[in-house]
Regions:
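Hydrophobic alpha-helical segments at protein termini of multi-pass membrane proteins
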Residues: 1-316, 320-328
Length: 328
């Protein structure tokens, strides 16, 4: 009589490439819950939660989306989250201070200057990481997107607060601003910093270092130009146009880097998968000393194949009969 063994049910995990959907749905539900509570109670204590969740849903979703595309990345979730938090805070503080000093000295703030200051400030944390690690360009792109998303989230919170105060507490202007910036955010700071960081992290891997630096400065100049164009248009249609172009460039670079990282030459058909497989022979054909050494890995590495045993693919010596035939 046989008894059936009950196996525990296997949990079906959502593919890594689709986890961003969970983040988006969860974040949207949280925003709707906070918004409903604010409307129902008219309690201003819900306003900070509304601004925080509304400004962070799309940036966190976009970071998760790009992180899911990088299967062989060396970055953990904690590292990416820390880069987003530190890069966002330090970037906004440094950029805001420099822009304030520039306005005080020059009396105005050109859009090109804004782009140069903010894009340089956002590269502070990735540049520090690059000094003590050697990540790949794809990891640099993910880090750049994380830093840019953190910067954009904090900036959106500031703009939403200004809109709330300027409108006398009306939520329509706040929700409209959050919606527009959320739609355009993946093609804004996240895309610009991601492109710049990918070019920065690719310098070490360049065969000619000068070419890597030249490529970085060209990409950085293009990023500043996109940023300046974004600020000069100052309209919803302009944001969507520049954001769409920036997002397309980011996706093209991501696809290229992911393809370049994932491409590996296949193994030869006759090559063993394990580096020591060529030493593993049936016990009847192996020297007794080799059997003992194979049972202790460090002995096999230290002494190699003992005398008297031959590799499995080595040709067998000719017999005496064949040798005598060849001599005649």
């Amino acid at each position: 009589m046989t008894t059936a063994v009950a196996h525990p049910p296997t949990r079906k995990m959502l593919p890594r490439q689709l986890r961003w959907l969970t983040v988006l749905v969860t974040g949207s539900a949280l925003y709707a819950a906070v918004f409903a509570a604010l409307l129902g109670t008219q309690d201003i204590l819900f306003v900070p939660s509304l601004l925080l969740v509304g400004a962070a849903v799309v940036p966190v979703t976009f970071i998760t989306f790009l992180g899911g595309m990088s299967r062989r990345g060396d970055l953990s979730f904690a590292q990416v989250a820390a880069a987003a938090a530190l890069g966002g805070v330090i970037g906004t503080v440094v950029a805001g201070s420099l822009e304030f000093e520039t306005i005080r000295e020059l009396g105005s703030l050109p859009t090109l200057t804004i782009g140069l200051i903010e894009e340089s400030a956002k590269l502070a944390i990735p540049a520090i990481i690059l000094t003590w690690r050697k990540p790949r360009p794809l990891d640099g792109l993910v880090l750049g997107v994380a830093v840019g998303s953190g910067f954009a989230a904090l900036e959106t919170m500031g703009y939403a607060f200004v809109a709330l105060v300027g409108s006398g507490g009306h939520l329509e202007s706040v929700t409209h601003l959050l919606l527009v910036r959320s739609v355009a955010e993946p093609g804004g700071h996240a895309a610009w910093t991601g492109l710049a960081c990918a070019a920065l992290f690719a310098i070490r891997g360049s065969r000619r270092r000068w070419f890597g630096w030249l490529r970085f400065f060209c990409v950085f100049a293009g990023v500043i130009a996109l940023h300046a164009t974004w600020d000069s248009l100052a309209s919803e249609h302009g944001y969507l146009l520049v954001g769409g172009a920036s997002f397309t460039l980011l996706m093209a670079v991501t696809w290229y880097l992911h393809r370049d990282t994932g491409a590996r030459p296949p193994l030869p058909p006759n090559r063993a998968a394990h580096p020591r497989d060529h030493k593993r022979q049936p016990d009847c054909h192996r020297h007794p000393a080799q059997r003992q050494r194979d049972s202790v890995p460090w002995l096999s590495h230290a002494f190699g194949t003992p005398t008297g045993s031959s590799p499995p693919n080595a040709p067998s010596p000719p017999s005496s009969t064949a040798a005598s035939i060849r001599r005649h």
